[in-house]
Amino acid sequence: QYINGCRFPCTIFIQNMQAKNDEHYRLDVKDNYITISGGTPHAIFNGTQTLVSLLKKQTIPAKLENIAINDYPDLLYRGMMLDIARNFTKKADLLKLINQLAAYKINVLHFHFSDDEAWRLEIPGLEELTAIGSRRGFTKDESQCLYPVYYGGWNPNDTTATANGYYTREDFIEVLQYAAKRHITVIPEIESPGHARAAIKAMEARFNRLKGEDMEKAREYLLSESAD
């Protein structure tokens, strides 16, 4: 109902076609109808994104010239890496980014959530990873938070600072599902054995918490030795 210039209203058809790959689509704008053709849901999604991009700068009701677009990627892996370890990205902003990746037909999000500077993903049963590893601020011994780096303020309890924050298990599931609906694969990265200082310090804190109760359990996830 928002497209004219072709004996308004305009009908949109979805059509199957033989394609070069799973993302190959064809978009045809005719006098009184639009056809999006593809061999997979991903292809149809890409065609829809192109149609949306054509409409974005239009006023409503929009007018499109007749056009035929035959499009497919030469590179099947088109990715972006997002580093939320050094500076945290809130979930709402990440979802906006995923929408933009979909608009540009980027199909992989490399999710870098752990590094020396922070650990940003909740792991049930290993609370110190986020209780300590996701916060930076003033500290003498890093028993409650990590040293401040990549300026994010000095207060480990400031939830507005880019130094602090993490994704809960539920947050991460939501991100995965949100991306999947937009045909984006999320590849989470756990940095190891190098660039693992946040996890190392978090597991040292876990060790110190449990060593008086159960030494075997305390050492279970310890990532360092006392002589290191």
Q: Model-predicted segments: where are they?
A:
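Aromatic/hydrophobic pocket-lining residues that form π-stacking "cages" and hydrophobic walls in ligand
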Residues: L97, V175, V186
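Contiguous, structured surface segment used for ligand recognition
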Residues: Q1-Y77
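Aromatic/hydrophobic pocket-lining residues that form the small-molecule binding cavity
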Residues: I44, L94, T168, F172
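Long, well-ordered, tryptophan-enriched scaffold segments
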Residues: H183-I187, P193
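Aromatic- and acidic-residue-enriched carbohydrate-binding clefts of CAZyme catalytic domains
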Residues: E117-K181, A196-D228
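Short, solvent-exposed loop/turn and secondary-structure capping segments
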Residues: G47, A92-L94, H112-F113, R120-G125, ...
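A conserved hydrophobic secondary-structure block that centers on an alpha-helix together
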Residues: M80-D116, R120
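Short, well-ordered coil/turn segments that N-cap beta-strands
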Residues: L75-R78, K105-N107, A180-I184
